[in-house]
Amino acid sequence: VAGRRGPTFLRVTLGKELRELRERTGLTAEAVSLELGFSRSKVSRVESGDIPLPKLADLERLMDRYNVTDPDDREVLLSLQRGSLSKEPYLSYRNILPSGMPLYLGLERDAVRIRSYEPGVVFGLLQDESYARAQMESAKVVEERTTDAVERGIRIRMERKERLIEPGGPEVHVILTENTLRTVIGSPAVMRAQYREIVRLSSLDNVEVQIIPDDLPTYRSSWNFTILEFDGLSPVVQSDSYKATTMWSKASDVGQYRRQFDDMAKAAPGPAQTPRILHDLEKRLWNE
């Protein structure tokens, strides 16, 4: 497993395994931290995947405390720990990313299915480079970003898109609102290029895009969210705020977002209608 997965996935998986072992012993995360001489929050942060567990001795002490004696069981955890310490793909970008985004990006790389709803801007994996540039440039002053930070942000976004065309890439299903696509980012020329990029990507076998028309009387979530599903790990949900990315893994939370997504997907015109909707929208907006 460790050889096929990214370090973020392995870190989160290791945390999940350690949490389950701790819960079987009836101990709290704080109690284990204090007993083993860790900082008060260390165990809970390791279990959530927020931080790695770089010291082999720390993992061995946890395994001993949780009565993990079988050599094979110990090797599974040791393998996860070793793999989780390899270089993070987005480590060099960490200083320009909002809080929580490095964890999300690391997990996105290993997702087998991605479902996203975006009511404000085009979902990052679908963005044309000119659209991404215009969006980031428009926020440059407000967010106090340097030109270098903008360029690096664009590079991240374009690198993420490459997974869509890689062998074994994820299944991607995106729901956008017409209002998102009517909101001009950059210029009409940028928007036309973005429309064409959505059409191009939606022609891929693993990508579906739906658009909720403005005049369709149906439910719309007020905030964006993305559901990531994995092979060998429970799904997670991500949502953005101004300065941070928040993630949920509780089954009831994930279920709630799944119901929202499924309801909107059922109501919106099917993916086959997306090229026509974009063509009609372009004609209405710019009379072409």
Task: Indicate residue ranges for each PLM-predicted region.
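C-terminal regulatory/effector modules of DNA-binding transcriptional regulators
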Residues: G168, I175, I185-E288
